[in-house]
């Protein structure tokens, strides 16, 4: 079994009922929904400096991040996965099965990603709900360290159970020791980083890795019922694509639009261009200039358009790049603020494209996830872990699984008791 840590016993977290832990975490997060809360003000400035994102983008991200962390959403996720909060406190009866206790694993190590704001926060709060000791390697903006201070103010036991290593190097002895002692390792990053972390972890540690993935948008012809609705879908698609400069697994980089709707593919492409221009004003690009790869992709699209193949729209100052009908044999452009748009006759073209380019999908946004069962089935078969609503791609629900993995289940082990 993985090595145990004594910090959990010292923190007193295991003696707290899960419902009190959940309530305290929800109360702490509620403070962070106030844009004028001093720790949030300081964190916002640090995130802007680290990521280069503009302040409106960071504020949008923090509103949605902490707005989701409520006692209701935490409870819904936990009860949906393990049956009840009480299962985290001790043995509970189960119909037709032995009594069981979902005991939190003592040591958890969590590694945040370089880009997505607060991506490790849900893992941290659910590990605490499971009464685990938590070591987290955070980015230099120290967002999680600041939130841990707020948790301490709510319940000192929470602060005693979490230790944040902000900006620490992966090879630092203190971090390597925490990684070796962890019974669970949760990590966000690229393939090489995940392999390195896995090799450093204990051989029998539970490893939950979230690699680099991307998202897409699919617009069914039935959704293009009139110009007003098409305009709304275009606006949502633009937000999904441009919000975080195309960073993170939930940024859409590819849009598939079915032909044959009341609003034509060409008209929707024009509406999408207008929407990108508007979103680029509301959420301006970060401080970095367009990368060379973006400029090269733009120039290639311009050359093809001059020959009568496809189209291209380039926002002022490189605020967005919209490429219409790029060659299907080319891999999709997973580039900052870059969106490729394809006209299709049916969902089979989407699945063929994804399969031929081995696109690692995290989510696909559609107009109405409940309205198109054939499309949703194809999305599920493509490897995507989530079917989102257009315009809400960047706002995942805390009560839902992430990356196809449960929220609380990675941090518990079941202990059964015979009758």
What is the predicted function of each stretch?
Residues 93-109, 168-179, 320-336:
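Donor nucleotide-activated moiety binding/catalytic core segment of transferases
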Residues 86-154:
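Conserved small-residue-rich beta-alpha loop and adjacent elements
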Residues 244-252, 256-362, 373-417:
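NAD(P)-dependent aldehyde/semialdehyde dehydrogenase
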Residues 155-259, 397-419:
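Conserved NAD(P)+-binding/catalytic subdomain of aldehyde/semialdehyde dehydrogenases
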Residues 112-113, 187-191, 220-222, 257-260, ...:
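Structural motif
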Residues 145, 194, 369-376:
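Short, charged/polar "capping" segments at the starts of alpha-helices
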Residues 2, 227-238, 265-274:
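Well-ordered, non-membrane alpha-helical segments in soluble/globular domains
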Residues 1-105, 364:
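N-terminal Rossmann-like NAD(P)+-binding subdomain of aldehyde/semialdehyde dehydrogenases
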């Amino acid at each position: 079994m993985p090595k145990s840590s004594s910090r959990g016993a010292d923190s007193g977290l295991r003696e707290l009922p899960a419902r009190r832990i959940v309530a305290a975490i929800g109360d702490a997060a509620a403070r962070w929904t106030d844009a004028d809360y001093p720790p949030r003000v300081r964190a916002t400035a640090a995130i802007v400096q680290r990521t280069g994102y503009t302040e409106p983008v960071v504020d949008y991200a923090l509103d949605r991040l902490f707005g989701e962390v409520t006692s209701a959403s935490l409870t819904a996720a936990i009860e949906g996965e393990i049956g009840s909060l009480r299962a985290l406190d001790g043995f509970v009866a189960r119909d037709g099965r032995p009594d069981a206790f979902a005991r939190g694993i003592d040591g958890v190590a969590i590694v945040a990603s370089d880009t997505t704001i607060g991506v490790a926060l849900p893992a941290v709060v659910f590990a605490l709900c499971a009464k685990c000791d938590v070591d987290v390697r955070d980015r230099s903006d120290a967002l999680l360290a600041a939130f841990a201070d707020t948790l301490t103010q709510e319940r000192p036991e929470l602060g005693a159970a979490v230790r944040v290593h902000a900006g620490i190097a992966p090879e630092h002895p203190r971090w390597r020791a925490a990684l070796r002692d962890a019974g669970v390792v949760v990590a966000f990053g690229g393939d090489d980083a995940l392999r390195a972390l896995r090799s450093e972890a204990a051989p029998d540690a539970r490893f939950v890795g979230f690699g680099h993935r991307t998202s897409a948008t699919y617009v069914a012809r039935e959704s293009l019922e009139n110009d007003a609705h098409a305009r709304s879908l275009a606006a949502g698609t633009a937000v999904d694509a441009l919000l975080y400069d195309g960073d993170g697994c939930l940024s859409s980089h590819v849009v598939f639009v079915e032909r044959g709707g009341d609003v034509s593919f060409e008209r929707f492409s024009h509406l999408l261009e207008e929407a990108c221009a508007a979103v680029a004003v509301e959420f301006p690009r970060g401080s970095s200039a367009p990368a060379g790869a973006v400029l090269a992709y733009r120039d290639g699209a311009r050359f093809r358009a001059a020959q009568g193949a496809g189209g291209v729209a380039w926002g002022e100052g490189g605020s967005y790049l919209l490429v219409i009908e790029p060659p299907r044999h080319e891999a999709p452009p997973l580039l900052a603020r870059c969106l490729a748009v394809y006209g299709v006759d049916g969902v089979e073209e989407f699945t063929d494209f994804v399969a031929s380019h081995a696109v690692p999908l995290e989510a696909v946004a559609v107009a109405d996830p409940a309205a198109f069962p054939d499309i949703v089935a194809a999305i599920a078969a493509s490897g995507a872990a989530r079917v989102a609503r257009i315009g809400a791609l960047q706002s995942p629900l805390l009560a839902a699984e992430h990356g196809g993995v449960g929220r609380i289940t990675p941090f518990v082990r079941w202990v059964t008791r015979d009758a």
